[in-house]
Each structure stands twice: as C-alpha cells, then as structure tokens.
Amino acid sequence: MGDVAPEVEISQYTKDKASCTRISIESYYSKRVTQCAERENRLKKLEEDMSARGLSDDEKDEKRKIHHSKETDYLRLKRTRLTVNDFESLKVIGRGAFGEVRLVQKHDTGHIYAMKILRKSEMVEKEQTAHVRAERDILSEADCDWVVKMYYSFQDYSNLYLVMEFLPGGDMMTLLIKKDTLTEEATQFYVAEAALAIQFIHNLGFIHRDIKPDNLLLDARGHVKLSDFGLCTGLKKFHRTDHYRNWPVTLPPDFISKPFESKRKAETWKRNRRAYAYSTVGTPDYIAPEVFQPNGYTKSCDWWSLGVIMYEMLIGYPPFCSELPQETYRKVINWQQTLVFPSDVPISIEAKATIKRFCCEAERRLGNHGGLDEIKQCPFFRRIDWNHIRERPPPIRVTVKSIDDTSNFDDFPDEDLSWPTSTLIRPEEQPGRRGEFVDFTYKRFDGLTQKMRYSDLKKQAKKNKKGQGSSD
C-alpha cells in the first residue's frame, strides 16, 4: 500500500470564503430569475394601462419606446457601483444604537433621500445582521403607498447604507410628544391608516412585530407610512423571550393601587420616551404578552400593538408605561389587572371598547380572525372612508416648507457631516466575512422616474426670497 496523503487542515477563513462564494452564486441566479419576472411585469402593467386609457397605436408605440429606454437606463444603473461619494450629506435627522440617519442629496439627480448608515461591526457583534437583512429584503419587495420606499442599498468595508424616501412629516412619536392627546376623530384616522399598512404587511406573509409610534412615519401631507421591518424575522435580541426570562412576572400587592395622576404620568413618559427610542434596550410597552411566552404568537400581535398606540393617542401615554422596562414587562404580562382607564381623561365608550378588543387574549383579539375586514366593522371606525382615506386631508396639518425641511425631526446640532471613513481591513478581519452581507446591493426601478430636483427648487426658493426682500 502507498503512503496515505496527510489531511490538509482548511482554515476558517477559507471555509468562510467558500461559504460566501456559494451564497453569492445562489443569489446571482435567483436574482436573475426575479429580475426577468419584474421586467415582464412592468411591461405587462404598461400594456394594461395603455389599453385602459384607450391610446392610439402611435401613442402606444411612443410609450413603449420611452419604457424601453428606461429599462436600458435601469440596466446601466444596476451596473454602476454606488458609494457615499455619490451623495451630499445635508443633516443628521436621527440616531440609534447601531448608526444614524442623514438627509442626503444625490449628486447626479438632485433627489433628496433619508440615508440610514449602520456599522457592520456593531451589527455582527450585537447579532443584528438578520435585522438589517430582513429590512432590506422586505423594503425591496414592498411597493405600496403604506410602506416607506427604499431606492438603494449598498455597502463598503465598514458600513451598510439604506437609501430611502425622505418623509418630511416626521413620525407619530414626535407628533404624540408635541400633543398632549389626540381627538377621537384624529385617532380614528391614524389608527385606520396604520391598520391598512399592517394589513399590507400581513398580506405579504410577514408579521411586523415592532409596531410603535416611532415606526409610523408621516409624509409631506401627513399620511402614515410604515417603516423598520427588521423584527419581521423575530430575531432582535431584546424582543426575544430569553431576554426577559429572568425578570419577575408577579405584581407587588400595591402595584395597581399606587396613585399616579394622568398628567404627571404623561409628563414622565414623554421625558423618558426619546431615550428609549435611541437605546439598544428599548421598551416593551407595545409588545403583545404572547410574544414573551414560549408558546409562540401569530400576526395578531401586531393588532395588540395598534391597540396600545390607540390608548396612547387618547390618554397621553401607553397603558403599561413605567419608569423601568422591567415594571412595564410585568404590567404587560399581567394586562388583565393593569389595563385600566384613568377617570381624569374621559374617552367614549366606543373608543374604550375598541382598545379592549385590540388588547385582549390573542384568540379573541380584533383582527385575529378577519384581519382588516373585521376591524372595518368596528363601530369606532364607522365614519372612516376606507377606500379613499389616503385622498382625504389628515386631521392634523403637517407643515413642510420645502422638500429638505427637517423641522419635524429632532435637532442634532454641531454634528460632523463628513462621511464615515472606510479604512481598508484585512479580508479575514472584515465584518460579515462569512457572507452575512452578500447581495446587499439594491436599486429601485422607479428611482429613475422621480420628479423633484433639490438644486432647482433651492435656486427658485432663493430667487423668491430675494424678490420678497426687494418689495418690502
């Protein structure tokens, strides 16, 4: 017998590279099939639209030529490598545990976007790669007025970038902090729009799992759009059951009887609210009790969260709020005892009944069996024109002076607007070297057809300002 060749030990780096290559190849061919189907669907949609409008053959030919030109431009765009140098950083409009959000302008088109910048090292270390991957995948799949649009996603050695439509109206959290409470009419409107957004996500086959005011964004007219889809995977650490496993669930004897005037409670909540929004720990205020349990949960957990938001709109703070997340958790688990309505903030019987139907056992919950159709039958929403709600003016007017107006966002003064440096890292030390961020790049087709140009509008605004100054 001949000598047996010694086994060659394969390094972890080589194994990671092989795994990454396999993922890349699978992703490449899967994407080619998807892109072909999307291209056919766009042409089919164009043909249906032209037939519905009764266009002549010559007009149809002209439309087809324009469409073909757009498809060619899109292919060219897809081959172009995007970097942060393609954008001008205008202002920081948000900050979180893993990065920040900036208002940016794309150099070649002048379009305005909100760019989310996430540090790869933080995402890997905090086990958040599934979070950002879920958000990227769902935003690329969703194409609806109820969901914030993502136009581009790309990466460099150090960071991930999600380039989304900028919604100048801010978010529901900011609106609720500004207002003590909302009227029942306003609450009906915003809860109805949020319900339509949630139903759209459910129709895609996803559970959002993180419905809260921070994730209900407002467009320039004040209509709701849903954002932040990372928890659709159910993998975010502080929303997993094991994070709360060692927390006590029983209430102390005087827990409910402690007097706490509503105004003072609302002030305390508002004071702590923003800190919770920017922390890695978060708050369990809006999470359904079954999410904490080992028996699992269904899409009805999103309807519970909507009920909590409805309570906050009418009362001024969520029903289970406490100074410590541990206390909030105990209140949520013991909701049968802690879901109470303060006597000093009166609301209608219908409103109270609707909240109780949202915040109850999962099997009895409003929306659990019939989804949006079941919610539409609720007496509290009888004045809502569900089919035309997005065409109606919102009950609270959003003031937006220009497409780059950030007055509805928090101020982050004296921030460094230079782009994060992306230093070259040895391949074996790169975050995501095992393929976590393979195929992260995305470019949206209708990004080619946006109309607004930031530079032109700014020039016009300056001209108008000069004209007004000379006439005074």
Swiss-Prot record:
One of its GO terms (biological process) is intracellular signal transduction. Its main location: cytoplasm. GO terms for cellular component: cytoplasm; nucleus. Its cofactor is Mg(2+). Belongs to the protein kinase superfamily. AGC Ser/Thr protein kinase family. The lineage of its organism: Eukaryota, Metazoa, Ecdysozoa, Nematoda, Chromadorea. Residues 382-452 form the AGC-kinase C-terminal domain. It comes from Caenorhabditis briggsae. It is found in: Cytoplasm; Nucleus. It is an enzyme of class 2 (transferase). Residues 87-381 form the Protein kinase domain. ATP binds at residues 93-101, 116. PROSITE patterns: AGC_KINASE_CTER, PROTEIN_KINASE_ATP, PROTEIN_KINASE_DOM, PROTEIN_KINASE_ST. This is Serine/threonine-protein kinase sax-1. Its EC number is 2.7.11.1. It catalyses: L-seryl-[protein] + ATP = O-phospho-L-seryl-[protein] + ADP + H(+); L-threonyl-[protein] + ATP = O-phospho-L-threonyl-[protein] + ADP + H(+). Keywords: ATP-binding, Cytoplasm, Developmental protein, Kinase, Magnesium, Metal-binding, Neurogenesis, Nucleotide-binding, Nucleus, Phosphoprotein, Serine/threonine-protein kinase, Transferase. It holds the Pfam family Pkinase. One of its GO terms (molecular function) is ATP binding. Acts with sax-2 to restrict the growth of both primary and secondary neurites. Regulates mechanosensory tiling by controlling the termination point of sensory dendrites. The active site is at 210 (proton acceptor).
